[in-house]
Amino acid sequence: DGTDFLFSPVSTRFPTGKKRTEDPIADLIVNDYESFVNSGALFSKNVALIKSYTNLTKEEQVGSDEVVAERFINHMVDNLLYIYDSVPESTRELSKQWYEGANKIVQRMADKHGISLAQASAVAANLSPQKDWYQNASLAERVMNIYHENINDSFDQNMKDKADVIYFNKDVKPPARITNREKLDLIQGKSLQQLIDEKVSPHVLGMWVRTWDQTYNSPNYRIVSPDGKFLEYAVNKDGKTRSRAGWGSLAEIGKALTAVMNPEIEVLSESLGDANKVRNFYNNIFDPASTLGFVTIDTHAVAAALIRPLGGKAEEVGANFGTQKGSSNSKVTGHRGTYSLYEEAYRRAAKEKGVLPREMQSITWEAVRGLFTSTYKAQKQNVTFVQGVWNQYNKGKLSLAEARKKINDHSGGVERPSWERSDFTI
């Protein structure tokens, strides 16, 4: 169809099944809500999950799948607009720039190492699961730096000692220790370049990079501003000690390395996998100006749409990613879980405010992190309180406005973002 794929985003659904009717590499598949509604049993199974959510009243939970899904989307749109309006305009003007800032940061990394923006964007996206952007940006920088600057370093005794601490500590279960030992045996004494030449699996390369990083780099990372500036170091809840960046899985690091090593869009697209969130995140970073409606639904995006203090293990979050028991995914269409419902809510809310869906997402993402801070979420009674408010709403004892006010008053309202409180830049 004449699309220039060198400057193209990637398909947001990645169907791989034999019966698929779309090719996510040859064509650009941009998920739309209609395709989700028309997905048959997949749609019904995912709507069955939301029929139990107390964000809907008992009356709203009853009805056909399409009707209940529509009510759920309308509820989320209402919540997102409420959060959007609760953020001062001066903050909104900055927080809507998150992906433009991410694009600048990733472009700087790409320029430094002579790789494409697409490669650097894929590195960041592949390292994004369960990470905030501050850590994510730091991890992406580490992978690119180590690959380009330390590729010929050999796996020395310092790294071996560090590997023993990382991969064989008391928290590592016996089966994982066995596979870790197998990987480590392949790595002993070798450089990253030697391992690449030996065509070892990306997981093994990931282990080498993580071990080098934890041996020779500081674990501290900086706060980032929405417009792409690095600010002071992130600190822990005590306000003094510096936070430490935590690596995700070796599979994720391996995928990031695959992206660093291969400029071909087919390889990059495949490295991103079938998670709708990771694929949208890549597009938002790679081309923040796109009008195709790409929107990254992560843990905080689900929390904002539902106005709930959710963590990565919450059922609603798992359902969004298609990892929660009872959620439904399809290799034939590439739909995963309830993602399409949230995506549609953000698109509709954005349209009402005349902003891009990714701008609606980053404004409300920042706000919900300030409404439910990590300190607030860490206390079980707070999570229980909010659950109780939605239970009352579900039973018709509170209006939506009353429920939101109760939650807002209890949490103390939206705390200003860390980058807005900072007067430090590098």
Label each PLM-derived region with a short phrase.
Residues 5-426:
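HhH-family (HhH-GPD) DNA N-glycosylase catalytic core used in base-excision repair
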